[in-house]
Amino acid sequence: MTRVLRVIGQLSERDRGLYLRWSLSKDSARALRETWILITHAGGTTVSIAAVALPLWLRPWDRSVTWVAAASLAISHLAVQVIKRFVGRPRPSKPIGIDHPDRFSFPSGHATSSLAVTLAYAVAFPHFAVPLVGFGLLVGWSRVALGVHYPGDVLAGQVIASATVLGVSLIG
């Protein structure tokens, strides 16, 4: 058990070090900060829900495609909320230009939801896979850049999203 705790401590220190190198500072260029804020909001709750609700309503493609995205979003969100409360990792203390949506950092909900939706659509529409998945990954990165998550939080959220989309796709 002591070895496991030591490894976790080492990973946490490494994560904090990467965070300090990769996150913006208050002195970063305004255009850079605003770009990352725009990207992070584009992967937020409203946009993620709209990305599944609008296609369900407008029916631009087979509804089963959107149901995979909706189920992936819902299941991954539930997993994130349970894990956040179980782990209880506090957020970094220096956000840039945005507020913390809640007090827990691990895993990142934005990274999870944005990748869950974009990956579900990427599986259904492989011609658009690169920009879709790229955008989902970029939203995750924005959370580190803006100082609201550690890199490990984002990576964990992206693993949850990927596993959820895989599971839902296999079942559906």
Where are these regions (language model features)?
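Membrane-helix interface segments
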Residues: 29-32, 61-66, 92-93, 126-131, ...
